[in-house]
Amino acid sequence: MDSIKVQQNIKTIGQMKANGVFENYIEYIDFPFYKNLIPHSKITFEFPLTVLVGKNGGGKSSTLHALFGAPKGYTCSDFWFSTDVDPIADGGDRPRYFYGYKTDKNSEIKEVMKTRIRRGGTKTKKEDPDYWETSRPLKKDGMAEKRRYTPVEKDVVYLDFRAEVSAFDKILH
């Protein structure tokens, strides 16, 4: 693909975002206290394609896991959970992140906080120390003081090529 075609595609995608083609679009994600990320790290998704690059341990996978867990019905606990060997130390604060999304071009931004809590066991549900749920907006984290919104409704496809490509293929192909 030549560079002119690439530039045309980028312009077209930018116009699509400006015209509101992408519904339930996550505009940004903020990490007040999440894994090894610097507190209040924020990513703004100004364009519908974002590339995360950086050294090992820089938080790329952690960011993707949070984005995976953002929509309704999904959780980052599929990837981040406490074990006896690798416990999650909260340092006196609950791991959490929030994001803002628009349902359509003209809607206001709705902010959703996701917080890791320890859910106690009940008759119908077992105890879960790695349970993530939405919580009320927290002014101390820089959220707009509005109401508690439901998570964005989106289908998620998570591809992790480390799990898809074998070591043999990585080395010999």
Residue ranges and their predicted role:
Residues 1-172:
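P-loop NTPase switch/coupling surface
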